Amino acid sequence: MRIILLGAPGAGKGTQAQFLMNTFGIPQISTGDMLRSAIKSGSELGKKAKQVMDAGQLVSDDIIIELVKERIAEPDCQNGFLLDGFPRTIPQADAMRDNGIEIDYVLEFDVPDEIIVDRMSGRRVHPGSGRVYHVEHNPPKVEGKDDETGEDLVVRPDDQEQTVRKRLSVYHEQTEPLVEYYQKLSEEGKTEYHKIDGTQPVERVSEQLGDLLRK
């Protein structure tokens, strides 16, 4: 069961990735984790990646694809894997196919921008413990204060409305074209593409995913 998760930041992919890993016993493959462990291990690819990153450049698709190939050849990926945050662009998706990396399911989490902005800009965090609140959906007992310590809650830079909107526009520009790309492959019978309504309650989304993938 080889799965790609698509969806804007804040669409709920992380929560559902956790559910899929626990339910189906497949690992989540994060390109960030792979880069860090390759650099730590001092492998050839790791050295190449480190040089590029030290120069403040973006790591090339070629290096990332090689890392993905190495990672999915490991024993824990025998029954499948979950890719989140990769591919981000059509050239990356093409490179995956050219390298024989097959995908069974592409799951897109569809949530309107305004709901994402509301979800993320309403988050408040207690820096000491990492406890997360939401001004509407999960408010603290006292506005702006942590329930347990009474200390101030903060808005993470990533959750500020301006930042959220910027990340959404990058997603629409770079990654959204992948939706069409995988829909086309799905029509050709080369993968299964499914759009999930990410505005539903978390449990409902998990239930839908479970039903879909157990078919």
From Swiss-Prot:
Molecular function, one GO term: adenylate kinase activity
Gene3D superfamilies linked: P-loop containing nucleotide triphosphate hydrolases
Region (LID): 122-159
Signal peptide residues on this chain, from the entry's feature table: none
Stretches the record annotates as NMP: 30-59
Subunit structure: Monomer.
Alphabetized NCBIfam families for the sequence: adk, PRK00279.1-1, PRK00279.1-2, PRK00279.1-3, PRK14527.1
Protein name: Adenylate kinase
Source organism of this protein record: Idiomarina loihiensis (strain ATCC BAA-735 / DSM 15497 / L2-TR)
Encoding gene (name): adk
